[in-house]
């Protein structure tokens, strides 16, 4: 990547003054929906319409398709050159919400909160968002119902992070933010794997921790099937030893 590219791009972005009639574009996405360890991160990237070509000039893709090094490079560029907001939902907060809700509703609430942050200041807004439910139309209707401006233009599609660079940018922000948090966990807990239920290292870490501490680590989502199964197996093993 050209070393001067970031500086040139940064200089070409106008100061983001809060002008009601100025059209802005928002891209929203999340990272960490499925893992048993760590937070879910929901992010939004905002650009003005006249500066949309600046973000489109970047070779952005869905964050999962980029190398770690390239994600981090773009993370820095996006943060420096555009306005970014994010919500980090810790495991305990996800567990609390899951008692009365589900992942789709939790995401919708976070998406709408981030969007309304800008809708309070701007009237002319277009939103690109990665639809997190099986029905794009149902997601669109539920999302719009939570917005303070019902007239806002919304593009809600599956795999929007692969189709629209503004959503790719939000995906990168969310992914790198979560990855950094996972790395900080490793400093405290050692190798915990990726945090996904199917990762053998993650499962081994959880199993070992529960055996040693008789509870889940604070970084685990207790409402996940993987966590519930491990706790159940631990309780059954204790009962088996007592019976013997």
From Swiss-Prot:
Cofactor binding note of this UniProt entry: Manganese or magnesium. Binds 1 divalent metal ion per monomer in the absence of substrate. May bind a second metal ion after substrate binding.
S-adenosyl-L-methionine found in the keyword field: no
GO molecular-function terms, A-Z: manganese ion binding; RNA binding; RNA-DNA hybrid ribonuclease activity
Gene3D superfamilies linked to this entry: Ribonuclease H-like superfamily/Ribonuclease H (3.30.420.10), Ribonuclease hii. Domain 2 (1.10.10.460)
GO cellular component, one term: cytoplasm
Binding site for a divalent metal cation: 29-30, 130
Locations listed in the record: Cytoplasm
Membership in a protein family: Belongs to the RNase HII family.
Protein name as catalogued: Ribonuclease HII
Protein species of origin: Methanococcus vannielii (strain ATCC 35089 / DSM 1224 / JCM 13029 / OCM 148 / SB)
Underlying gene: rnhB
């Amino acid at each position: 990547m050209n070393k001067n590219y970031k500086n040139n791009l940064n200089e070409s972005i106008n100061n983001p003054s809060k002008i009601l009639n100025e059209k802005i574009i928002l891209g929203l996405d999340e990272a960490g929906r499925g893992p048993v360890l760590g937070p879910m991160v929901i992010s939004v990237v905002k650009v003005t319409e006249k500066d949309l070509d600046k973000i489109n000039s970047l070779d952005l893709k869905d964050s999962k398709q980029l190398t770690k090094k390239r994600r981090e490079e773009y993370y820095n560029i996006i943060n420096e050159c555009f306005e970014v907001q994010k919500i980090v939902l810790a495991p305990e907060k996800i567990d609390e919400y899951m008692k009365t809700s589900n992942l789709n509703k939790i995401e919708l609430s976070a998406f709408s909160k981030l969007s309304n942050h800008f809708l309070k200041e701007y009237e002319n807004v277009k939103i690109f968002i990665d639809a997190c439910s099986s029905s794009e139309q149902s997601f669109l209707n539920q999302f719009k119902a939570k917005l303070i401006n019902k007239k806002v233009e919304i593009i809600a599609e599956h795999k929007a992070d692969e189709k629209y660079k503004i959503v790719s940018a939000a995906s990168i922000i969310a992914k790198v933010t979560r990855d950094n948090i996972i790395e900080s966990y490793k400093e405290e807990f050692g190798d915990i794997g990726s945090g996904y239920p199917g990762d053998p290292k993650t499962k081994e870490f959880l199993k070992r921790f529960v055996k040693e501490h008789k509870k889940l680590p604070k970084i685990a989502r207790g409402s996940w099937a993987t966590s519930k199964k491990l706790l159940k197996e631990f309780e059954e093993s204790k009962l088996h030893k007592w019976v013997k």
